[in-house]
């Protein structure tokens, strides 16, 4: 894993991309499926796991519970036959929001769990009240004190009980947490207004492969009938739809022809529809392969982010970068998370014309972007800056790579292989702006 705290990305824009890129496994599947492996007392082999800082950190959380975990290439093996402690480490969980979701699996296995409140990207309030109320409905006693969530199941058996749970919002994390908890509960659990994201379906399929009884994943009503025990599994996670979308947008903004493999087109329907709206041609070459063709003119469009199957909030920032060069005025309404438009000011540093009011961004297309030093403020914002840098004239230097490395598997290497002039350079932060003002062309990049 690159040491992003002392590195910057330098991008010399204006070069078309060409070639093929293989999409890695889904970050948001990998994290929750690793947590789901705690439900099983046998061996779990998880394939197609991306190389990410978040995955590495999740592995550290699981190992800290006393669980055996090994990794080789894109395969992770987990044996949770013995979970030695129910207390997750504060310093790790507070850095990774998804690690909190393991509370459902730990509570289901042990009848007790102690989990610090989560961390991750600072993109607005993402409370855990839905998780807590759902676990309480299943019979758990839950208290939050001093930033620690303490949960236990009263009684000698320590087994959660099935319940009918309505989620006020279709929270992905709450749906996944409660689905995991319900797999080993006594009786039937029904989750109403459940999240429908592909990663929720992937977790359900993983649990079903271990012997769980889950019906309705991918719809707003999920029914889980608890079983006494789950068995070993060998499972491959789905491709990352957000990484795929990011490369499609990178191809669109650079007017390039590239091919993406290891994709699920059905997971990209809203994004592909918007790309076609603005004039981009997307061809489904095969059931797991897409090709993007360059558009002569990019047209403005409006976007409202929504829970799946709507336009994904994780693609809002990358698509905003694309719309900075579209002809006309676009409106982007971020309705899923608050405080998720901070990348607009950084895009404006590159010459974009974006005005933000509340959770809405008004984007007026400009003829060109110009390279400048910028800082990624969160994971998807960093991706947006990479995309803009690929199209900008001159040199763009991006700081804050620890965000990017949380969610993209070697994105700079993959872009190099497509012909982008992009380099990861280790340097002290104080020198980054000085380096950014040096507009010399890079040495040829070996691919």
Swiss-Prot record:
Enzyme class: transferase
Job description of the protein: Cell wall formation. Adds enolpyruvyl to UDP-N-acetylglucosamine.
Family: Belongs to the EPSP synthase family. MurA subfamily.
UniProt source species: Trichormus variabilis (strain ATCC 29413 / PCC 7937)
Compartments where located: Cytoplasm
SUPFAM superfamilies in UniProt: EPT/RTPC-like (SSF55205)
Pathway: Cell wall biogenesis; peptidoglycan biosynthesis
Protein name in UniProt: UDP-N-acetylglucosamine 1-carboxyvinyltransferase
E.C. number(s) listed in UniProt: 2.5.1.7
Binding site for UDP-N-acetyl-alpha-D-glucosamine: 97, 126-130, 314, 336
Active site per the UniProt annotation: 121
InterPro entries: Enolpyruvate_Tfrase_dom, Enolpyruvate_Tfrase_sf, MurA_subfamily, RNA3'P_cycl/enolpyr_Trfase_a/b, UDP_GlcNAc_COvinyl_MurA
Superkingdom field: Bacteria
Keyword set, alphabetical order: Cell cycle, Cell division, Cell shape, Cell wall biogenesis/degradation, Cytoplasm, Peptidoglycan synthesis, Pyruvate, Transferase
Gene3D superfamilies: Enolpyruvate transferase domain
The keyword Magnesium is annotated on this UniProt entry: no
Sites where the protein binds phosphoenolpyruvate: 27-28
Reactions mediated catalytically: phosphoenolpyruvate + UDP-N-acetyl-alpha-D-glucosamine = UDP-N-acetyl-3-O-(1-carboxyvinyl)-alpha-D-glucosamine + phosphate
CC terms in the record's Gene Ontology section: cytoplasm
A molecular function GO annotation: UDP-N-acetylglucosamine 1-carboxyvinyltransferase activity
GO biological-process terms attached to the record: cell division; cell wall organization; peptidoglycan biosynthetic process; regulation of cell shape; UDP-N-acetylgalactosamine biosynthetic process
Residues recorded as bearing 2-(S-cysteinyl)pyruvic acid O-phosphothioketal in the entry: 121
């Amino acid at each position: 894993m690159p040491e992003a705290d002392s590195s910057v990305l330098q991008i010399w824009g204006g070069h078309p991309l060409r070639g093929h890129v293989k999409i890695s496994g889904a970050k948001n599947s990998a994290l929750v499926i690793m947590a789901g492996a705690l439900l099983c007392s046998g061996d779990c082999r998880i394939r197609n796991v991306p190389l990410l800082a978040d995955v590495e950190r999740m592995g550290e959380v699981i190992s800290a519970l006393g669980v055996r975990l090994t990794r080789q290439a894109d395969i992770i093996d987990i044996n949770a036959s013995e979970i030695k402690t129910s207390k997750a480490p504060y310093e790790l969980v507070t850095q990774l929001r998804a690690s909190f979701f393991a509370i459902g699996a730990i509570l289901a296995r042990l009848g007790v769990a102690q989990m610090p409140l989560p961390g991750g990207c600072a993109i607005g309030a993402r409370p855990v009240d839905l998780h807590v109320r759902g676990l309480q409905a299943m019979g758990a006693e839950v208290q939050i004190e001093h930033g620690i969530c303490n949960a236990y199941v009263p009684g000698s058996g320590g087994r959660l009980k099935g319940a009918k749970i309505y989620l006020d919002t279709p929270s992905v994390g709450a749906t996944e947490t409660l689905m995991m908890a319900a797999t080993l509960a006594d009786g039937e659990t029904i989750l109403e207004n459940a999240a429908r994201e592909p990663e929720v379906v992937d977790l359900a399929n993983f649990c079903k492969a271990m012997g769980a009884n889950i019906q309705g994943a991918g719809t707003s009503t999920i029914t889980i009938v608890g079983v006494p025990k789950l068995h070993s599994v060998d499972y491959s996670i789905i491709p990352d739809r957000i990484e795929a979308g990011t490369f499609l947008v990178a191809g669109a903004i650079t007017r390039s022809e590239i091919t993406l493999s290891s994709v699920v087109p059905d997971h990209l329907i809203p994004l592909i529809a918007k790309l076609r709206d603005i004039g981009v041609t997307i061809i489904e070459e095969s059931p797991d392969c897409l090709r993007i063709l360059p558009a002569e003119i990019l047209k403005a469009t409006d976007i409202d982010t929504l829970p799946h199957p709507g336009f994904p909030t994780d693609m809002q920032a990358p698509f905003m970068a694309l719309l900075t060069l579209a002809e006309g005025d676009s409106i982007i309404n971020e309705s899923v998370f608050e405080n998720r438009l901070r990348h607009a000011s950084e895009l404006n540093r590159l010459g974009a014309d974006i005005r933000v009011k509340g959770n809405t961004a008004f984007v007026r297309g400009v003829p060109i972007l110009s390279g400048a030093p910028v800082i990624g403020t969160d994971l998807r914002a960093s991706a947006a800056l990479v995309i803009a840098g690929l199209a900008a004239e001159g040199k763009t230097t991006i700081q804050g790579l620890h965000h990017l490395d949380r969610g993209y598997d070697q994105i700079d290497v993959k872009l190099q292989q497509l012909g982008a002039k992009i380099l990861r350079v280790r340097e002290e932060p104080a020198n980054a702006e000085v380096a950014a003002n040096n507009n010399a062309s890079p040495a040829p990049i070996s691919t």
